[in-house]
Regions:
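Bacterial N-terminal signal peptides that target proteins for export
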Residues: 1-11
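Bacterial N-terminal signal peptides
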Residues: 10-21
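Non-catalytic cap/lid and distal C-terminal segments of serine-dependent acyl enzymes
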Residues: 19-328
Length: 328
């Protein structure tokens, strides 16, 4: 084998190892258990079920997990608030169960800290839940396909006051983006260790994270990345662009991050806190001890879920049974 061929193989091997290592570094860490699923058409109340719907926006089936409240079958005239939960990078709709979030919510409910609501977690690939410049339209898949389908198919109250969105890591970007672009649709937005990116990565950056982010962002914002498109789909800028509508909606904002976040996301989260303060936008922000990922989220989940539940309660409609709509 000649010298040039050996060099080419060596460089290719390093590149493959680099991307694999960074992908593993960015994936939220926690041991995964095999999810338990049911073959029934409707979810078992209190348990997690997996389903899908045809999505025009992404040109294929949009998979999702759904959890119905324990009283769903027993109290057949009652409608419920709904939470849309967005997973992080390298995840899918099953993360919500196998990473322990569903169990954490059930525990909070059993302890009387929160009440009953429906939870839906769609599969978002590594899309950042936006309409990619040259790819799939995940913002439209959620806003135009998923939410109408869920609220037609299940007994959801279906008012902005009883609809919430939440995300972890990359899903935090997505939750904030969708909430700020469509503030009239949600009562609350809550995030844990949101993957906020205040600027495009330096194309000359040689560190592993910069190179991986450049590769990822190129698939979403164009190659080379389109700066204007990046700002138009970045919650750190969208909040300013749509500030009047956000304030008018009265949407409640909560976010937190670990002080020892291994991706350094505590810094852009702190900057985001400062920006919202300067914009005069009410919000709640916390830095808690902890790293990045699912284990961190579970350790502080009571803060965000009590926050969204208290805002659901402010509407009052879920505290008593709501009569079924005609034709249900």
């Amino acid at each position: 084998m000649d010298l040039l061929m050996q060099l080419a193989i060596g460089i290719l091997s390093v590149m493959i190892t680099l991307v694999a290592n960074v992908a593993a570094h960015l994936m939220p860490r926690q041991a995964a258990a095999t999810p338990q699923t049911s073959s029934s058409a409707q979810p078992t109340p209190g348990g997690v079920q997996y389903s899908s719907l045809p999505s025009e926006a992404i040109g294929k089936e949009l998979k999702f997990a759904i959890v119905l409240p324990p009283s769903y079958e027993r109290d057949t005239k009652r409608r419920y608030p709904v939470l849309y939960f967005l997973h992080g990078m390298n995840g899918n709709e099953r993360e919500f169960e196998r990473r322990g979030v569903a169990a954490a919510i059930s525990k909070l409910r059993d302890e009387g800290k929160i009440g009953e609501f429906i939870i839906v977690s769609p599969a978002g690939e590594n899309s950042f839940y936006l309409n990619a410049k040259n790819g799939l339209r995940y913002e439209d898949a959620i806003i135009k396909d998923l939410i109408p389908y869920i609220e037609k198919t299940y007994r959801v109250i279906g008012t902005p006051a009883t609809r919430s969105i939440q995300g972890i890591s990359m899903g935090g970007w997505g939750a904030l983006l969708l909430a700020f672009k469509h503030p009239e649709m949600f009562s609350t937005v809550t995030t844990h260790c949101a993957a906020l990116v205040p600027a495009l990565p330096n194309p000359q950056g040689t560190d592993r994270r910069s190179q991986f982010m450049l590769q990822l962002i190129g698939r979403i914002f164009g190659d080379p990345p389109d700066e204007a498109y990046f700002r138009a789909a970045n919650p750190m800028f969208v909040v300013e662009q749509n500030l009047a509508a956000i304030k008018k909606s009265g949407i409640k904002i909560y976010f937190d991050c670990g002080e020892q976040d291994r991706l350094g996301l505590q810094e852009p989260n702190k900057a985001f806190d400062e920006k919202l303060t300067k914009l005069g936008l009410a919000h709640e922000f916390h830095l808690f001890p902890g790293n990045h990922g699912w284990e961190y989220m579970i350790s502080v989940a009571d803060h965000s879920y009590m926050f969204l539940w208290n805002n659901f309660k402010a509407d009052g409609k879920h505290t008593t049974p709501v009569r079924s709509r005609a034709g249900d």
